[in-house]
Amino acid sequence: MHIAIAGNIGSGKTTLTGLLAKHYGWSPHFENADNNPYLNDFYHDMQRWSFNLQVYFLNTRFSQVLELRNSGNTVIQDRTLYEDAEIFAPNLHEMGLMSTRDFKNYHSLFDLISKLIQPPDLVIYLRATTPTLVHQIQKRGREYENTIRIDYLEQLNQRYEAWFSRYSIGNKLIINVDNNNFEDNPDDLNKVITAIDGQINGLF
């Protein structure tokens, strides 16, 4: 079984992935931002590095999906392959930070790859308002994230809402992060687990 956590920057994907992996005994697959060779450059010069970054993400997530599908284990993944193509790349293109030529090239790669993989059995979307995202980004203190603009987060949030409302290739669940502190409150985490149990039981 393949479970995936989706959500904006700072929504708590990595934290929830770890907590759920521990609770259920699932194999976690994390987005390793610290080892990304483009991320720091991207946040300092988005226009120069946007295409490189998106292709890097596409490559690593495609490899990850193939690996987890072949493992035979129940896996929980931090961020989906679809978020890059449906949210981040179109947003960069609309902002003038990715050329039309690069955007078309990127999307042709995504269209090809998406035909070769199965979607997750369940996608959990962590919905959070911009103030919550900013608070959590500041809390974790990654230096390269200090330059993220508020309007950038807001635009991503709008795209997340639009994407998840039309997502129809698998089961889905929404967790409202503004009202659920699953990291520090065991009762809130139990609410998440109960909701997931209801979804998982419906898969069999």
Which ranges hold each PLM region?
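Hydrophobic anchor at the beta1->P-loop junction of P-loop NTPases
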Residues: 5
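Glycine-rich phosphate-binding loop used to anchor ATP phosphates in small-molecule kinases
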Residues: 49, 53-118
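Conserved substrate/cofactor phosphate-moiety recognition/catalytic segment
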Residues: 22-60
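Post-Walker A alpha-helix
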Residues: 16-17
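NTP-dependent small-molecule kinase module
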Residues: 134-204
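P-loop (Walker A) phosphate-binding loop of NTP-binding proteins
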Residues: 8
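Conserved lysine of the Walker
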Residues: 13
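A glycine- and Lys/Arg-enriched "phosphate-lid" helix/loop adjacent to the NTP-binding pocket
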Residues: 87-161
